[in-house]
Design a protein with these regions (language model features):
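Active-site helix of classical SDR
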Residues: 113, 149, 157
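C-terminal substrate-recognition "lid" of short-chain dehydrogenase/reductases
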Residues: 110, 125, 203-232, 237
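Conserved glycine-rich Rossmann-like NAD(P)H-binding loop of the short-chain dehydrogenase/reductase
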Residues: 24-40
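Conserved glycine-rich cofactor-binding loop
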Residues: 10-12
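Residue(s) in the substrate-gating loop at a strand-loop-helix junction
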Residues: 133
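Alpha-helical segment proximal to the catalytic Tyr-Lys
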Residues: 118, 162-166, 223
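Substrate-binding pocket helix/loop in short-chain dehydrogenase/reductase
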Residues: 89-90, 94-102, 184, 191, ...
């Protein structure tokens, strides 16, 4: 049984992650920001512990990680799934949009990894799994700011893997494609159908697709895998 902290646990992919790790027999704490009712429901369903936090605030992250470690008795696995999207033409993207994306997608990952690393270094081991995006690899029109933040997550994954590897800590990034979650509710049925047709396997992804890889990367079988950015995109970003 692993002690797992999942950020952004009340969101689409996050819900799938919480369910999967709980079904795997692991002890789970997850964070949420504003969706209290969803967090309560997920906690009741899975038995996982929910903690409210604004992960763009470094002080809140420090307190949250400390609380999670106390609840779990340490942290073996961090899965950082918190984040937001923004679909806009580049010249219409505001400073506020940019700042919000940086805060939610990149700063939050930096803060979470930094605080959890302090615990894992003391334990002489651990697994960090960051949820990026295929757009961090290939870029997306009308999602320039989002793509840039996810490219930052990609770079941080690789740098952290080099620094933390000698201490027994692996760091990997999962890069989902178009996943059928509330984050992509901005797409109408026709757009979703077109995206599915553009995906070689012929469908959109599910949170369960992402969670399956996270479970593997957290397992003992993945101990020699680090610094990797693995696509779960149905072949979209080939």
């Amino acid at each position: 049984m692993k002690k797992v902290l999942i950020t952004g646990g009340s969101g689409g992919i996050g819900v799938g992650l919480v369910r999967a790790f709980c079904q795997n027999g692991d002890k789970v704490v997850f964070t949420y920001h504003k969706n209290l009712e969803a967090a309560k429901a997920l906690s009741a369903e899975t038995g996982a512990t929910a903690l409210c936090a604004d992960l763009g605030d470094s002080e809140q992250v420090s307190l949250t990680v400390r609380s999670a470690a106390e609840t779990l008795g340490g942290i073996d696995v961090l899965v950082h799934a918190a984040g937001i999207a923004c679909v806009k033409l580049f010249d219409m993207t505001t400073d506020a949009d940019w700042d919000a994306l940086l805060r939610a997608n990149l700063s939050s990952a930096f803060y979470a990894c930094r605080e959890v690393s302090k615990i894992m270094l003391g334990q002489h081991g651990g697994r960090m799994i960051l949820i990026g995006s295929m757009w961090g690899k290939v870029g997306a029109s009308c999602e320039v700011a989002y793509s840039a933040t996810k490219a930052g997550v990609r770079g941080m994954t690789q740098a952290l893997a080099k620094e933390l590897g000698p201490s027994g800590i692996t760091v990997n990034c999962i890069e989902p494609g178009v996943i059928d979650t509330p984050m992509n509710a901005c797409f109408d049925a026709d757009t979703k159908r077109e995206l599915a047709e553009q995906t070689p396997v012929g469908r959109l992804g599910t949170p369960e697709d992402v969670a399956a890889l996270a479970i593997f990367l957290a397992s003992d079988a993945a101990s020699f895998i680090t610094g990797q950015c693995v696509g779960v995109d149905g072949g979209f970003a080939i």
